[in-house]
């Protein structure tokens, strides 16, 4: 139902994973996705769990700038400069932790364009999606890219103030055709 409410297309029951909070699922997603030496783009400033999960999985985190002078939005040109032949994906934390920035549709569309051009998987950490103020509205990046493979994360700890309850979910959206081995790995984990 969450995916329906957020307008996230192409998600079936077998595309949803539950876990002991989003933290567990982030680690699991990286362990199934990364090979030694693979690079993941991560926002700076970042939520430290992403760095740890990437390193634990044999990957290398590469920070892209979220510019304070631009309301903490990701610097798209900096993202493009950081992409190498080893880059496999991009982490998007929206709303961002720790900055609190809520990314506008235009920024999300630019990130989608970069991901398409470079065949990157987007890992969308959107656990703060219900904690937006002042009539702002969160847009799930997956709702803008029904064709693009995106790994989405959310849970109850922030929006329902039950951090100790440890209930999170991860859903896979978009075209999963080229990611069967990854999905099989997740199923084993």
Walk through the language-model features, giving the residues of each.
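Substrate-binding/gating loop at the entrance of the active-site cleft, primarily
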Residues: 20-24, 28-31, 42-59
């Amino acid at each position: 139902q969450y995916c329906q409410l957020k307008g996230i297309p192409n998600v079936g029951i077998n595309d949803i994973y539950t876990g002991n909070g989003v933290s567990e699922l982030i680690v699991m997603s990286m362990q199934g996705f990364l090979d030694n030496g693979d690079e993941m783009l991560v926002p700076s400033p970042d939520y430290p769990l992403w760095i740890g999960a990437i390193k634990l999985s044999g990957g290398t985190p590469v920070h892209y700038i979220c510019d304070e002078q631009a309301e903490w939005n990701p610097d798209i040109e900096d993202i493009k400069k950081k992409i190498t032949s080893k880059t496999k994906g991009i982490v998007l934390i929206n709303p961002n932790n720790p900055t609190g920035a809520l990314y506008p549709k235009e920024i999300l569309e630019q990130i989608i364009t970069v991901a398409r051009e470079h065949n990157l998987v987007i890992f969308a950490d959107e656990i703060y999606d219900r904690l937006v103020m002042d009539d702002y509205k969160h847009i799930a990046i997956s709702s803008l890219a029904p064709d693009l493979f995106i790994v989405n994360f959310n849970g109850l700890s922030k929006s329902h103030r039950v951090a100790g309850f440890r209930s999170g979910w991860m859903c896979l959206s978009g075209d999963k055709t080229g990611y069967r081995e990854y999905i099989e790995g997740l199923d084993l984990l």
